[in-house]
Amino acid sequence: MVFKPLTIAAAIAGLTPFVSAFDAQAKSNVAVYYGQGYGQQRLSHFCQETSLDIINIGFINTFPDQGAAGWPGSNFGNQCDGLTYEVDGVSTKLLSGCHQIAEDIPICQAAGKKVLLSLGGASPDNQQILSDASAVRFADFLWGAFGPQTEEWVSNDGPRPFGEVVVDGFDFDIEHNGGFGYATMVNRFRELFALVPERTFYISGAPQCPIPDPQLSDAIAQSPFDFVWVQFYNTAGCAASDSINGVSTGFNFDDWVDVIKRGANPDAKLYVGLPAGPGAAGAGYYLTPEEVYPLVDVYMNLYPETFGGIMLWEATASDENTFSGLTFADVIKDILVAVDPSPPVPSPSSSSVIASSTPVASSTPVASSAPASSTPISSGSPVPSSSAVSSSPAVSSTTESSSTQVVSGSVSASSSPITSSPVASSTPVASSAPSATSSAVASSSPIAPSSPVASSSAIASSSAIASSSAIASSSAIASSSAIASSSAIASSSAIASSSAIASSSAIASSSAIASSSAIASSSAIASSSAIASSSPVAPSSPVASSSPAVSSSAIVSSTPAVSTPVASSIPVISSPAIASGSAIASSSHVASSSTPAASSSPAVSSSPVASSSPALSSSPSASASSTPIIPSSTASSAVVSSSPTPSSSVVRSSSLLSSSSPALSSTRTPSNPVIPSSSAISITPSSTPVRSTSSVAPGKSSSAPVIPKPSSTVIATFTSSSGSLPSSSAPAGSGVPSSSTLPHPSSTSLLSSSPVSSAEPVSSSSAVGTSVGSSSNVVTGVSTRSSSSVVPSGTPIPPVSGTATESVTSSSSGSGSPTVPSSINTSSTDASSSSSASSVEPTSSGSVITSVTSSSASRVSSSSSSVVITNPSVPSDSSSSSGSELSTTSSTESTSSASSQTGAPTTSVSLGSSEAASTSTSGAAASGSGAQDSTKPTDHASTLSPSYSTPLASASGQTGSPTTVPAGIPTGNGSGLAPITSSITSAQAVPSVTSSGLESEPEPTITTTVIVTSYIDICPEGFTTITTTYTTTYCPATVSATATATAAVTNPPGAPAQTTSPSVPEGWTTTVTVCTHCAPTPTTVTLTLPATNRPSALASSTSAPNSPEDWTTTVSVCTDCGPTPTTVTVTIPVGAATGVDALTASPSGSQPAGESSPGQSAPTAPASTAPTTTETVIVVPSQSSTSQPVILGTGSVRASSTFHIQPSQSGSRVPVAPSGTAAGVSPVFTGAASRVSRLQHGAGAVSAFALFLLAAI
């Protein structure tokens, strides 16, 4: 069995929680059993809980001495598909298809949890070891099957039910037939553990509370156990409930301490085993949290060296037993931590400073020093300065109760770097000496917040600037300041400079940064004024800091700095949610341009041009750190005020740039991303002082939330332009402000307009929309440089917006009113100004490329999105030049090809998972007609969908009819039907002509039709996505047909993609086997496409004129879905057309779900008189970690060779459906909850699936 390493790595990257190192010696650990809960969720769901430290997966419930063929058997409830191994024709009880568990165990381990495999359970009751030799063989078998994989085991075809996944040890929950052999097994395990000294493995046991326990007392005395969690329930006279009921001879924890001290390992930790809910044990044995607290308080303090924590039976019972939104395990963890006088300090993630391997040398020294003073500058001449600050401190997360020092590294990447170090004080930092360094500077300072930081240090200068000289400010602050806090930091600081330039680097971070080592923004774009903004964030309690960070120099820039990407050899992931808002104002009181959380002071800016440009670091992969920051709900509001202020100074802003050219990286390592929780950035235009408040929703009291809901962050830019000057300039003393206000506070979402660095007045600013969909969004934003590029009124601007659960699509029209679906998240606001600047000349086209890469987070499907937007410059008459180039930036290997013709800006979006955002507008159509809305809002709570980047998206821009082709199949794990995408696109805009007459072509015409169909089955355990490509090739003249069904889908790992090639004279039939984990017998769907007669136009193929010439195009796809790549060969003749017959089909573009149904032909490319190129889009998603792999085709169901063990060469072993198991689902039993009524499964899951499948067909 070979599980895809990229799939597991992506899932781990998306679900890395607030990791603290596991401490086996802690007194506050929580252990829980998993695998036997009724209707239990996937293991990954419980990995999200920070309260859980140890998870026992149960059970290996059949022992070799009682098992078929001498093999053990397993039962993990609803988490396996029912297939078992077969030995020499004998079906064993060892499950072979437990893909979900195999996918989820590494995620739990990456979250700092230990996963043990439990032996025993309450059923069956014949479990027994008959000899020491049998005990040794049993231990060796389990070590080979579930321990580290060895070549010897694989070469002998040994079973690996979990693939290459390795458990962290073994648990003994022995309920029957005495204790013989278990000490031998434990000692044998210890010998095997010693073979892998680089990894720690554990042994645990769950005896019942009577002393001595008939099953495990001997093993505890004779072999070393690490943990002993006694079942203090279901047995009267020793249960924990006896201590509550006042039974003097009851709760015998003291006696068990003596058993431990006399055992083979006197240092073993003793846990109190409790039921996790009223129904998890017999009546009267459940303890409420109020009853647990005094018990823990007494015994933890009485036996601090032996008390280890609490064991719970079982995970699903805890999950369903909630208290104000907290599970029972959460509450128990809170109790343990509260009582524990010295809880273990979590180990922070790697805090190494990663400097760029290609430092940018300084080319222009700083011509003047900027003293750290708040004195306003009154001068008649500008102060020349040319510096750019790229501050990127790398931080890592700390818990609420610790103050771990975090090393931050800043890399200067500009024409004249100035290192801005974050300091833990209120002293502003500024450069006071010329700097011409060419080395990357890594500064470090401790950032140790130990409580939620609600810093609302919006610093405003109260001194006016009496400057009468023209000041051209071009400040670009490439700040990706990461705040290390266990909860969200509402705001870094909004700083208003008291100098003539109010370029105040307002870093309104709406979510904390989850990067143990950040790389500075790859380029400082045309930044000529550096604000050494160093507002410290080092509070140990809630802080309302008001320390000024003031730059008091008037800055004039004459030479823009050349932006040079910093190629980092060690890529990291920085936060996608840093909105670096720079306010450019003239001489007036300048308040905070970004009002952070809890700030209610009015934001009054004298400059109506206040662009909020996100400072986003682009890095496609993460460093190998292991500690993310999981903030609580955070919101920050950037308030843009346009209240005019009389001023005699002229301010020309050349535009703030998103200082995030792609930080090129050549390696990809496991990431530890940020998982923002409900972060939202709203930018509100206003013509009066605005009171902005932000709500900070803290996480639960026990610890930071691990897997929050997907957040939605849309950052827009407000551009005001009514005259030749962007500022509110007016004759001195006139008191009459110019009319450069924000006329359309909520118009079309403006992605970008080209910035200007020339001396001409301009009202243009750039903003890069960012889509925060999951844990580690990497947004690359590049604004091309041109002169005086202003988008006139009425020109549709393609917006980019996206959320993880809801999509935001805005189709712009001439009226400037946005089109927003009803499912838009209220925390996501798309707004921009669509006013025109009458005195600005149109310039050459500029393109903005935004690449969005989303890793997966729990319950957040991941995707690799490549968004390519061409925004040609348009003169005032809304016409655009043709031939605009499209370029694509994608952190993963996603390909987009498009052809943009006159007046047709084309958007090609390659989307997967639950993110969907695409909009096409026609530049030539003033009313925006022809825009095609293909956004599919998906609100599925999916479980760990891996990141995939296989879609090939092809879009053709036709005259007046733009086309949007989203390629990819969203996945989800909800109760609704996930979108099903079928798409076929062509690159020609020739109308199709449907012919109903007979075709008289003497030469046969070959047509290739590709149907992309996705079937999704929904079961309580998860869902499976199957995408099968059917290709049929036939000659209309002979009406003969052959068909091949290429099963490039999610197969069981290691199993080759199966292909069936029926050849039927009258048609073809393909059989698909799906959802083997919902029923013992595979469900068969038969799709029949009969051969069509030529008189029938509806089923006819596209006919092209005969020609001896032809050409062939070969497309290879899905190299990671099977052992060999799938090749599709398309052969199309070329010649002069005499007639065109077309299939009846939907227009080129996105085909809604369910339209590619049996008996309906897929659309094909229309032909033309010129040589026609038909591009076939084959959408083949990689295996989703949320789905149960399925075998397609008519071949026999067979796993890879690693599924089987062959003691002799004569037997063949194939996984078969178990016999005697109702509905193909393993029976549910209570396991460690001994002698309690067993839970039973029904056939509801199978019925639901069958009904759904029939409806889908």
From Swiss-Prot:
Residues 1-21 form the signal peptide. Keywords: Carbohydrate metabolism, Cell membrane, Cell wall, Chitin degradation, Chitin-binding, Glycoprotein, Glycosidase, GPI-anchor, Hydrolase, Lipoprotein, Membrane, Polysaccharide degradation, Secreted, Signal. Residues 28-339 form the GH18 domain. GO terms for cellular component: extracellular region; plasma membrane; side of membrane. It is a lipid-anchor; GPI-anchor. The active site is at residue 175. The keyword Cell membrane applies. Residues 700-715, 940-964, 1145-1154 have a biased composition (Polar residues). GO terms for biological process: chitin catabolic process; polysaccharide catabolic process. The keyword Membrane applies. Induction: Highly expressed in germinated conidia. Expression is induced by tunicamycin and DTT. It comes from the Eukaryota. Glycans are attached at residues 825, 973. It catalyses: Random endo-hydrolysis of N-acetyl-beta-D-glucosaminide (1->4)-beta-linkages in chitin and chitodextrins. GPI-anchored chitinase involved in the degradation of chitin, a component of the cell walls of fungi and exoskeletal elements of some animals (including worms and arthropods). Required to reshape the cell wall at the sites where cell wall remodeling and/or cell wall maturation actively take place such as sites of conidia formation. This is Endochitinase A. It comes from Aspergillus niger (strain ATCC MYA-4892 / CBS 513.88 / FGSC A1513).
